[in-house]
Curated annotation (Swiss-Prot):
This is Small ribosomal subunit protein uS17. One of the primary rRNA binding proteins, it binds specifically to the 5'-end of 16S ribosomal RNA. Part of the 30S ribosomal subunit. PROSITE patterns: RIBOSOMAL_S17. InterPro entries: NA-bd_OB-fold, Ribosomal_uS17, Ribosomal_uS17_bact/chlr, Ribosomal_uS17_CS.
């Protein structure tokens, strides 16, 4: 038999934190551009994900990378893996 190493390729997405009001949870807005099948125009599609934030360290406006994990709760199956860019404070 072939001894192959099993690697888990978890999906990662980059989005903006739009809410951090829940305990240990942030809401991340992920936007992507999709070409319209008929008109050919690029349209911005978006989706919100609830992501696990163990230490409550991320604030609204932060650009974060989230990674797919096992389900933590009914609506939460993603976890924040790293901070890409902090929000600018004015």
């Amino acid at each position: 038999m072939n001894d192959s190493v099993k690697t888990s390729l978890k999906r990662t997405l980059v989005g903006k934190v739009v809410s951090n009001k829940m305990d240990k949870t942030v809401t991340v807005l992920v936007e992507h551009r999709v070409k319209h099948p008929i008109y050919g125009k690029y349209v911005v599609r978006s989706k919100k994900y609830h992501a696990h934030d163990e230490a409550n360290t991320y604030n609204e406006g932060d650009l974060v990378e989230i990674q797919e994990t096992r389900p933590v709760s009914k609506t939460k199956a993603w976890a924040v893996s790293r901070l890409v860019e902090a929000a600018r404070v004015i």
